[in-house]
UniProtKB/Swiss-Prot annotation:
Keywords: Mitochondrion, Ribonucleoprotein, Ribosomal protein, Transit peptide
Transit peptide residues according to the UniProt entry: 1-50
Keyword Transmembrane helix: no
Protein's name according to its UniProt entry: Large ribosomal subunit protein mL53
Keyword Transit peptide appears in the UniProt entry: yes
One Pfam family of this chain: MRP_L53
GN (gene name): mrpl53
Main location: mitochondrion
Location in the cell: Mitochondrion
GO cellular component: mitochondrial large ribosomal subunit
Similarity comment text for this entry: Belongs to the mitochondrion-specific ribosomal protein mL53 family.
Annotated Gene3D superfamilies: Glutaredoxin (3.40.30.10)
């Protein structure tokens, strides 16, 4: 069974920058429908998508802004469609790892670990005999 993919999850904006007449834009042009289709837009309505059609011979780039404010650019002139999808998913996973590392955890010292735990006396049925 195919895994459902939500490319726009955790993204605040996506900007496609490319020259439509450049022959190296095949991958970026095939990626655009994945983010502009009805299902993708319904799953992430807060993500804005825009296009910047640049001058001739501009190399194709996807600028991504994540919900936490991080911005990344992906140059797509030498990438295939699946490589673009995988790189975006890896970026989202790395953002998630950074968020987890930033979370404060209670620090446990070696003294706390080695200190014995005080147990209450068993007052069950055996103690009442």
């Amino acid at each position: 069974m195919r895994e459902k993919l939500n490319l726009l999850a955790k993204l605040k904006s996506v900007v496609y920058k490319f020259d439509p007449l450049n022959p190296n834009t095949r991958s970026i042009r095939s990626f655009i429908p994945l983010t502009t289709c009805k299902r993708s837009r319904q799953l992430a309505p807060e993500c804005s998508i825009s296009f910047d059609l640049g001058p001739q011979n501009t190399s194709p780039v996807i600028d991504i802004k994540f919900v936490n404010g991080t911005e990344k650019s992906i140059k797509t002139d030498t990438l295939e469609l699946m490589s673009i999808v995988e790189s975006i998913e890896l970026l989202k996973k790395s953002i998630r790892i950074e968020e987890i590392e930033k979370m404060k955890t209670t620090e446990t010292t070696l003294q706390d670990i080695l200190q014995p735990v005080n147990k209450k006396k068993d007052t069950g049925a055996k103690a009442n005999r």
